[in-house]
Amino acid sequence: MDKSKRTFRKSKRSFRRRLPPIGSGDRIDYRNMSLISRFISEQGKILSRRVNRLTLKQQRLITIAIKQARILSSLPFLNNEKQFERTESTPRTTGTRARKKKIGLLLN
């Protein structure tokens, strides 16, 4: 058999299949906070389906459960810890330029 006519075969690499993040016994519900908190970022955002490795149906159910938990205030809308940190105040500049313009207009 000629080399050009031979089919090119790649060696198949074995890969370990990841376990699904949601087991068959887990209920996707707004009260199941331990499950819901796995699919929320540190900022409080809902993680995407690619990051979560969920099916479309599971992602939809998780999203609905997170939104219900937020509305019932068992989960915050935002996780802003920076909100309470005090930042250094910047010195305010006085409007000397604006005053000079006003004075110049009054003199003319």
From Swiss-Prot:
Its main location: plastid. Keywords: Chloroplast, Plastid, Ribonucleoprotein, Ribosomal protein, RNA-binding, rRNA-binding. Residues 1-23, 83-108 are annotated as: Disordered. Coiled coil: none annotated. The keyword Zinc-finger does not apply. Part of the 30S ribosomal subunit. This is Small ribosomal subunit protein bS18c. It comes from Illicium oligandrum.
